[in-house]
């Protein structure tokens, strides 16, 4: 899923993940947070991104951390 998020940011084009449209702003926030956390938390984030509910929680968390 991280590859898809990076693709959304790179191409500036929304895409569907788990049946949800993900816009560039949300994808960018998620990628930024992912890149800033340590390896252990990156693994946890990758695990969360495998389910729709986890993906939504991750998106909400990432958006709350972007100022």
Where in the sequence are the language-model features?
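Charge-dense, intrinsically disordered terminal/linker segments
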Residues: 1-67
């Amino acid at each position: 899923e991280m590859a898809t998020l990076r693709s959304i940011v790179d191409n500036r084009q929304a895409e569907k993940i788990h049946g949800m449209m993900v816009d560039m702003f949300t994808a960018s926030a998620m990628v930024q947070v992912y890149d800033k956390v340590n390896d252990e938390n990156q693994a946890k984030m990758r695990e969360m991104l495998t389910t729709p509910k986890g993906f939504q929680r991750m998106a909400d968390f990432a958006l709350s951390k972007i100022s």
